[in-house]
Amino acid sequence: MEVNLLQYEQKYHNYIVAGVDEAGRGSLVGPVVASAVIIDKVDIISGIKDSKKLSKNKRDILYEQITSNYVWSTAIIEHTEIDDINILEATKKACTIAVANLSLKPEKILVDGNMKFSDVRFISIINGDNLSLSIAAASIIAKVTRDRLMLELSAEYPQYLWHKNYGYGTREHIEAINTHGLSSYHRKSFKFC
């Protein structure tokens, strides 16, 4: 059964609604990236869904369409700040900054997950990237942005295979850490590191 990805946008049809999602929260290395997107409820881009369910090629195409047609913003919190304030607070900060940087002020903010925000406009939706078109669009922007950053870092540290694992704890990545030690981009606060 296909889910109506506009159910939340329709529920809040009288409001300016932004969707927010992050990429990189579970990674061992690099930044966490959050994106906020306000979709055009009349001009819906076809094919938008949770970024994890799309091929890299399809994500790249949708990234260009979303960034060309919708209001969007991205915020990046670097690994050093993640180590200072913890990954949850860094993720919340990235989400808040992404929303603040939008050129339109949203009245309702749909965010993937179960995070709690002091700003009452935030509405946390578990599995939101599969339930809201705005959140799904934000997931695409966040993932493509972070993946591109990790490809740049991979050129500096090719031994960690970030061009394949994007900093996540794959077997090959763990083996590379055991062989080469930590890079300057690894999150030192993570238990593994």
Swiss-Prot record:
Catalytic reaction(s) noted: Endonucleolytic cleavage to 5'-phosphomonoester
Q: PROSITE patterns, from UniProt?
A: RNASE_H_2
Please report a single Pfam family linked to this protein. RNase_HII
Q: The organism sits in which domain of life?
A: Bacteria
List the record's Gene Ontology CC terms alphabetically.
cytoplasm; ribonuclease H2 complex
Describe how the cofactor binds. Answer: Manganese or magnesium. Binds 1 divalent metal ion per monomer in the absence of substrate. May bind a second metal ion after substrate binding.
SUPFAM superfamilies, sorted = Ribonuclease H-like
One MF term in GO for this entry?
RNA-DNA hybrid ribonuclease activity
**Annotated keywords:** Cytoplasm, Endonuclease, Hydrolase, Manganese, Metal-binding, Nuclease
Positions contributing to a divalent metal cation binding: 21-22, 112
- UniProt-listed Gene3D superfamilies: Ribonuclease H-like superfamily/Ribonuclease H
Which segments constitute the RNase H type-2 domain? Answer: 15-193
Kindly list the biological process annotations in GO that this record carries. Answer: DNA replication, removal of RNA primer; mismatch repair
Cite the EC number. Answer: 3.1.26.4
Top class in the EC scheme: hydrolase
Family according to the record: Belongs to the RNase HII family.
NCBIfam families per UniProt: PRK00015.1-3 (NF000595)
Protein name (database record)? Ribonuclease HII
Organism of this sequence: Rickettsia typhi (strain ATCC VR-144 / Wilmington)
Encoding gene, per UniProt annotation? rnhB
